[in-house]
Amino acid sequence: MQKNPQNRVEAAHTAQPIAEHSAIDSAHRVVNVCAVAIRNRDGLVLTVRKQGSEGFMMPGGKPEPGETPLQTACREVSEEIGLTPDPDRMHHLGLLEAAALNEAGFTVRAETFEYAPTDEQHEQLATLVPQAEIAELRWVNPAMSSPSDSAAQAPLNTEQIFPLLARTPLP
């Protein structure tokens, strides 16, 4: 991971749009998405459960044709939880992979960001409500202090994102 957050933002701004047909690569059994980690002031991470799913994941989703990963990340956060992110406050954490939660036998490949909410947005975090296809919101400790914290979490969260956030200071 680069030490200068500004470089991460610039890299995300200039990333190439994701090809129209590349969200699901059936030949390689890969689902390409963008995921966004959002931590509150207590360090808890927002996870979401989509309708029809029993597991929790980061806000995010599949790209629309021509979108860059950063554009996808911002759009999905706005659609799913009603928070309008400032793209300059998105920090690219990397391209992370794990077993897909909802697509058996597939790997999810996620351009992963952490969003640093503004002071005003930190106040909004306590009153967020599920929107669009989201059925439930859950705040969890990325240190995964108990088995019940991790039981319903996506492998991408437990194997990649939470360990990364647990050793990363709050933005």
Task: Set out the residue ranges of the language-model regions.
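Nudix hydrolase/Nudix homology domain
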Residues: Q2-N7, E54-F56, P130-P171
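Conserved N-terminal beta-strand and adjoining loop/helix that marks the start
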Residues: A12-V45, K62, F113
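Short connector loops at helix/strand junctions that flank enzyme active sites
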Residues: V31, M58, H91, T107-A110, ...
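Short, charged/polar surface micro-motifs in flexible loops or helix N-caps
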Residues: R39-L44, S53-E54, E64, A98-A99, ...
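Conserved Nudix-box catalytic region and its N-terminal flanking loop in Nudix hydrolases
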Residues: N40-E80, T84
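Residues at secondary-structure transition points
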Residues: P63-T68, E103, A132-A135
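A short coil-to-beta-strand element that immediately follows conserved catalytic motifs
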Residues: T84-L95
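Active-site-adjacent beta-strand/loop module that shapes the phosphate/pyrophosphate-binding cleft
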Residues: L96-T127, R138-A143, I161-P169
